[in-house]
């Protein structure tokens, strides 16, 4: 039996090169990061999770996100750019870039996840200005 729904369903497709790049140990130069993301922007995903504004100690691969933004061509793309932030400072930096439409915050109830992703405990994460 099919389930009837009276509310509209909307699906947003997100591509996350940031997630892939942050796991690569060998540094990817700004030009190469921008080239990859520009190619993804041409596809037309709803959202492109492209970089992060976190401590370079936490994710060295994405330390140049601000430089990558300057090389992105969003003029003919319908994709919205999303960046990950680990705290209020990262959120403030991200808002300096009009190109960034969405911010993601890696919250979890897992202490291990929080320690690895934002170097925070659950209590500390709950107290941030981002929640």
Locate the predicted segments by residue:
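Alpha-helix-loop-beta-strand connector modules within alpha/beta enzyme cores
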Residues: 58-83, 124-131
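Catalytic domains of carbohydrate-active enzymes, especially glycoside hydrolases
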Residues: 35-51, 95-102
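Distinct, well-ordered alpha-helical segments
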Residues: 61-66, 91-97
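N-terminal small/glycine-rich loop or linker at the start of catalytic domains
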Residues: 2-25, 102-117
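Active-site beta-loop-alpha junctions enriched in small/polar residues
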Residues: 16-18, 53-55, 84-88, 108-110
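Glycine-rich anion/phosphate-binding loops
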Residues: 27-34, 82-92, 115-131
């Amino acid at each position: 039996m099919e389930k009837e729904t009276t509310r509209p369903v909307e699906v947003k497709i997100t591509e996350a090169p940031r997630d892939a790049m942050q796991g690569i140990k060998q540094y990817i130069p700004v030009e190469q990061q921008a080239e990859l993301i520009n190619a993804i922007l041409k596809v037309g995903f709803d959202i492109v999770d492209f970089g992060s504004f976190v401590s370079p100690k936490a994710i060295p691969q994405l330390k140049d996100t601000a430089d990558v933004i300057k090389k992105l061509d969003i003029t003919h793309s319908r994709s919205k750019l999303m960046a990950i932030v680990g705290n209020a400072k990262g959120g403030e930096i991200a808002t300096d870039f009009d190109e960034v439409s969405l911010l993601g915050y890696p919250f979890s109830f897992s202490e291990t996840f929080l320690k690895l992703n934002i170097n925070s405990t659950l209590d500390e994460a709950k107290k941030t200005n981002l929640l």
